[in-house]
Amino acid sequence: LANWRQGELEEELIRMVRLTRPEVIITWMPGFFVGENHGDHQAAGVLATEAFDSAGDPAVFPAQLAGPVKVNETLLDGLQPWQAKKLYYFPDSADDIFKGTGPTYQTNGMAKALKIPYWRAGFETFKYHLTQYRKFIEGLKKMDEKQVAEQEKNWGGEGSFTLGKSLVPGSVTGDVFEGITPGRIAFVPPARVAYEEFAELSVELGGPWGFYEKFRQAHRISKLPKAKEPEIAIKRGAALTIPLDLHNHTDAAKNITIAVKMPDGWTTESGAGNLPLDPQSDYYWQVLIDAPKAETKERQEIECTASADGKTLATIKISVQLRNGGLPQN
């Protein structure tokens, strides 16, 4: 989000919502799961959620609502606020926790407008993907009709969504257009959230795990599926970064001890030990751990314990799946 300039992208996405006036918004699941390490996918879900909650608010990017009154003002948008009616997410993870959280569709069903199966529509669209898999895509383009038909085993199957928000009547697993009627609905501002107060001396898991927890609270989507404990998939032999947010809101200097418990084969690179904290200060700390190169099918659990003055402040557990290949941690 920092690299993409979040504010600028949010403005553009809200402009697009006001321009096209969608009844339903469908986007990536904003969360951190095994199988969900794609930072750009998660960022898209964050921006779409913000657009759902803000495009109907006339106080958000009001310049988009200004219309031309002079000859030289032709670049003004003259748009109107627009409140979408439903928000759905689709996960990239195959975890069972997503079952029953929204409608399910068979991708071998026929797309009426296109007169081809849904999987085939996805297959054809994928050919225009420009940033990845170019060699693979060139191979797809060379397939004859028989070879394309054989791709159903790879592209067909079941597709499902997770209902994030609905401002109209309907069921959780009903069709995405269930309850939708043409026309505007009133803007529904997300209720304000009272975050928990930090203890005078506290430690919490930061990074994407901490962000998505707060993001879901802020946008009232805390009921979305989430892992039983923080989790991630990394490449065997890679480094695991555990971000910690440390807070000393007392008037005295404090020492916090970070201890790491891990399975055999893992090694601590940095971040464990004693950390001095100045009075009324906040620190952003990282524990770096090297994963073993040996193959293992079982998930590994890493445990970080923070203590001070003889008391445990926090015990943070992360479930790690080691793979042959993996995306960079972000």
Task: Describe each region flagged by the PLM.
Residues R236-P243, Y283-Y284, T296-I302:
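Short, solvent-exposed loop/turn segments enriched in Ser/Thr/Gly
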Residues D245-T250, A291-P292:
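Asparagine-centered strand-capping/turn motif at beta-strand->loop junctions
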Residues L1-L65:
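Active-site beta-strand->loop->alpha-helix modules in alpha/beta enzyme cores, enriched
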Residues K293-P328:
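Terminal connector regions
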Residues P276-D278, D290-T296:
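Short, surface-exposed loop/turn segments at beta-strand-coil junctions that are enriched for proline
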Residues M262-T268:
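Short, solvent-exposed loop/linker segments at beta-strand-coil boundaries, enriched for Pro/Gly
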Residues S202-P243, N274:
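Beta-sheet-dominated interaction scaffolds and their linkers
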Residues S54-S222:
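The feature marks non-catalytic terminal segments
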